[in-house]
C-alpha cells in the first residue's frame, strides 16, 4: 500500500471518451512493448481458468487469456485472444460469445457505433452454435444476444437493461458460478457507470444487488481478478471504501502483467 500512496497524489484522470473495437492495431497496455507482433500468449495475467465446452486445448488457453484480459479492461487484447480461440475451434460457441462480449460498452467508455455489426455477428454465431454449449454457456450466449442490435441504436439503454436482466436470470440459475456473478455485477455497473453512490453516500438503486453479486463471487473465489477489480470500483466512492482493502492488497500480485489491475488497488488506498 505504501508504494501506491507514494506514487498517487491525485484522483485518477477521467476515463477517455471512446474505446476502439478489438480489431484496431494499437498496442494494449498489458502487453510489454517488446512483445512480438500479432497474437501472443502471456503467463503474467494470472491463473483464472474457466473450463469451456471445447475439447481443443488451444481454444481453451486462448479463451482463458481473453477472459483474464476482459476482466482487466484490456478489451482490445481480449478480443484478439477470443479470435484466436475461434480460429482454434470454429465450433466453440462460447469463444464467439467472448468476441461479442468485449465489443460492448463498459463503465469507462460507451460502445462505439462501428462495433455494432461485428458484435451482433459474433453473438449470432454463438447463438447458431448454442446447442454445442453447456447449460451455463447457453445462458451467457442468450444474454449477449440480448445485448446487441444489428445496427447501432439511438439509445442503448433498453439493450443494456435486457442484458442485465438476462444476466440476473443466469445468476439465479447458477448462483455458485463466480464468473456469472461477476458478469452480472458488471452488467449492473454498465447501467450506472461511476454512479453507484450519490454525493451524500447513499447507494444507487442497483448498487445493493451489485455488491451482493461481487461479495458472493469473492466468497466463491477470493482471488477472482474480475471480482476484486469491480469490487474496488463499486466501493471506492462509498462511505466504507476500506471494505475492499483486503482484496486490493492481493490484486497486483494475482495478475502482474495486467497494467490496469496493477494500478487498481490505488483506487482504494487513496480513499483510506
Cite the ranges covered by each PLM segment.
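Sec-dependent signal peptide recognition
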Residues: 1-2
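C-terminal motif of bacterial Sec signal peptides marking the signal peptidase cleavage site
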Residues: 5-7
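Bacterial signal peptide processing site
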Residues: 9-11
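Juxtamembrane proline-rich low-complexity "stalk" or linker regions positioned immediately after a signal peptide
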Residues: 15-26
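Short coil/linker segments at helix-helix boundaries
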Residues: 28-176, 183-223, 228-251, 255-258, ...
